[in-house]
Amino acid sequence: MAKKSKIAKYQKQLQLIEQYADLRRDLKAKGDYESLRKLPRDSNPNRLKNRDKIDGRPHAYMRKFGVSRINFRDLAHKGQLPGVTKASW
């Protein structure tokens, strides 16, 4: 489980990215890099680190499912991920 402050910071960063997305797109199209530089640093989507939707873990994130490898394994064993089966050969 990640610290609650890290999860809160992640949520705040998501809101900033959404808030400035249109303005950022327009400024990039114009080529106005000076105004882009004045936007908040965390409004840049490149700075976003993907986190597990369940417990906020930043490492071993599986993009297709939105969870870390640990939670993926638990959910797969419980049968809560549609289409995921245990491999056997």
Swiss-Prot record:
GO BP annotation list: translation
UniProt xrefs under Gene3D superfamilies: 30s Ribosomal Protein S14, Chain N (4.10.830.10)
Region (Disordered): 34-54
Gene Ontology MF annotations: rRNA binding; structural constituent of ribosome
Domain of life: Bacteria
Matching SUPFAM superfamilies: Glucocorticoid receptor-like (DNA-binding domain)
Record InterPro entries: Ribosomal_uS14, Ribosomal_uS14_bac/plastid, Ribosomal_uS14_sf
Keywords, ordered alphabetically: Ribonucleoprotein, Ribosomal protein, RNA-binding, rRNA-binding
Keyword Nucleus among record annotations: no
One GO cellular component term noted in the UniProt record for this chain: cytoplasm
Pfam families listed in its UniProt record: Ribosomal_S14 (PF00253)
Function statement: Binds 16S rRNA, required for the assembly of 30S particles and may also be responsible for determining the conformation of the 16S rRNA at the A site.
PANTHER family to which the protein is assigned, alphabetical: 30S RIBOSOMAL PROTEIN S14, SMALL RIBOSOMAL SUBUNIT PROTEIN US14M
Protein family per UniProt: Belongs to the universal ribosomal protein uS14 family.
Assembly and interaction partners: Part of the 30S ribosomal subunit. Contacts proteins S3 and S10.
Protein name: Small ribosomal subunit protein uS14A
